[in-house]
From Swiss-Prot:
Keywords: Chloroplast, Plastid
Location(s) in or outside the cell: Plastid, Chloroplast
Classification via PANTHER family: FES CLUSTER ASSEMBLY PROTEIN SUF (PTHR30508), UPF0051 PROTEIN ABCI8, CHLOROPLASTIC-RELATED (PTHR30508:SF1)
Main location: plastid
Protein family membership: Belongs to the iron-sulfur cluster assembly SufBD family.
Cellular-component GO terms for this entry: chloroplast
Keyword Plastid part of the UniProt annotation: yes
Gene Ontology process terms (BP): iron-sulfur cluster assembly
InterPro entries per the UniProt record, alphabetical: Fe-S_cluster_assembly_SufBD, SUF_FeS_clus_asmbl_SufB, SUF_FeS_clus_asmbl_SufBD_core, SUF_FeS_clus_asmbl_SufBD_sf, SufBD_N
Taxon lineage: Eukaryota, Sar, Stramenopiles, Ochrophyta, Bacillariophyta
Pfam (any one): SUFBD_core
Superkingdom classification of source: Eukaryota
Designated name of the protein: Iron-sulfur cluster assembly SufBD family protein ycf24
Amino acid sequence: MTNKSNKILNTNITKLVNQPYKYGFSTVIEKDIIEKGLNEDVICLISKKKNEPKFLLEFRLKAFKKWKEMKCPDWAQIKFSEIDYQDIIYYSAPKVKKKLNSLDEVDPELLKTFEKLGISLTEQKRLANVAIDAVFDSVSIATTFKEELAECGVIFSSISEAIQEYPELIEKYLGSVVPIGDNYFSALNSAVFTDGSFCYIPKDTICPLELSTYFRINDQKSGQFERTLIVAEKNSQVSYLEGCTAPQYDSNQLHAAVVELVALENADIKYSTVQNWYAGNNYGEGGIYNFVTKRGLCAGSNSKISWTQVETGSNITWKYPSCLLVGDKAKGEFYSVALTNNYQQADTGSKMIHVGKNTRSRIVSKGISAGNSKNTYRGLVNISNKAIGARNYSQCDSLLIGNLSNANTFPFISVQNPTAKIEHEASTSKIGEEQIFYFLQRGIPIEKGVELMISGFCQEVFTELPLEFAAEADRLLTLKLEGSVG
């Protein structure tokens, strides 16, 4: 190809990746906030506002003490300005009645916001097969299908509500998978979390609906610190979906969440995420700092936890969904697509810790880097000396778009049992002139050609997503890449 055609090609492909962020609007609403700053008084005030039992306040204060003794981790392949934790609002909520009895009492502006995001909470329009918990800044504003789920014993509510109604379950499981001192950001979350979702699936129950939580950050100065806790009892199954967006601001906002999953004997938890926080502008200004701890405990024999994620947003992503395979014949899975563009930075991956006998794990990671972005996969497979017959398969593939993006892979494998079997493979490829020229020769436009290549590259992960998310994820990747191949 000539230099002129190369220029045209690069210009066309660059147009393909940069599409305006359509969720960047904000909602003007009357708010109840705790002034910015972080100390014991703020933590006590959060607990008081939520009328929490004594054990939870003690949990928070213990976590805060631990956090003050810790340092922000600096080993990841990401660079960002130092976060001023005293310049963050830790509680921001729409002003509402203390107890909402129906959606009629929810501020119409909030309902309109979620409608614009494609999340309908009203009875006439809500999805028939998905129960949704909608979280706006620091609080849950509505949960659908609670009564229908309760009929088969399934508890699905905001974690704030669960603390009031099922304190014994919260006290038993909160912090049981991610201890308060696990890492810097989980300790912060344990001290200041304000809401999130709680799911409890009783013994011998298959949850009849997909459970879903949609997180929306709205306030420019606030962070979001939600907590999700899912417990699946013996012989139960549940599928949980998670989505998120945020307004388009020039400044950065902090999102530090914790997710804990507990699967008992023969239980199956499938956890899917489409992460679409605001990523910042084309020059790397603004966007969400996304520091998340996700971990599942396969406590019972034959239990299974599967993580599937599509990461397209955030200025910075630091996230490693993991499985502790304690029960014999337990199984852990991780399927991921991480897309970075412009000046985004992602350091993400998974940990599979094998403890029980004949445990199995599978990791499939797909990284796509465009623009000036940096995309890093970081994985740990640990086989303990008790994990007789453990098996792991890991696959890490990177796709580079353009000449300025960066992809790294850091696998770490530790084996203490000679009966274990580990397989690891990795590849790096690039969308270049030859591939594009191949499509053009056959009358296929650049946009369609790139879309087909990316869709094929990610197919192994997309097939693991629930039907409701799979088509949306494919479409989202295409939109995110509008304008960036070059």
